[in-house]
C-alpha cells in the first residue's frame, strides 16, 4: 500500500510537501512548531521544578540528620542525668535530694514571681 504523494505518485510541482496544498501544509507545520515550542517550555518548567525539589529534599535531609544527632546527644545527656538521680535516690542521701527539690521549687517560684511582676 502506497501513501499518496510519496514516490512516483506525487503530482507535478509539489516537490517536498508530499502532495499537500501549500497553505494546508504550512498551517500544519506552523501548528506543529507552536505545539512543539509549547511542549518545550512546559518540559523546561517541569525540569526546573524537579531540580528545585531535589535541592529542597537534600536540604531537608541534611536538617533531619542534624536534628537526629542533636536528639541522640540529648537522649544520652538525659539518660546520664536520670542515672545520677537514681543513684542519688538509692543512697542514704535522701535529705540532700529533698533539699535539692525544695531549692528547685524555690527557684522556680522566684522566677515565676519576677516574670509576673513585669
UniProtKB/Swiss-Prot annotation:
Residues 116-118 are vesicular. GO terms for cellular component: cis-Golgi network; cytosol; endoplasmic reticulum; endoplasmic reticulum membrane; Golgi membrane. It is found in: Endoplasmic reticulum membrane; Golgi apparatus, cis-Golgi network membrane; Golgi apparatus membrane. InterPro entries: BET1_SNARE, T_SNARE_dom. SMART domains: t_SNARE. One of its GO terms (biological process) is vesicle-mediated transport. Signal peptide: none annotated. Its main location: endoplasmic reticulum. Residues 26-88 form the t-SNARE coiled-coil homology domain. Keywords: Coiled coil, Endoplasmic reticulum, ER-Golgi transport, Golgi apparatus, Membrane, Phosphoprotein, Protein transport, Transmembrane, Transmembrane helix, Transport. Coiled coil: none annotated. It comes from the Eukaryota. The modification Phosphoserine is found at residue 50. Belongs to the BET1 family. This is BET1 homolog. The lineage of its organism: Eukaryota, Metazoa, Chordata, Craniata, Vertebrata.
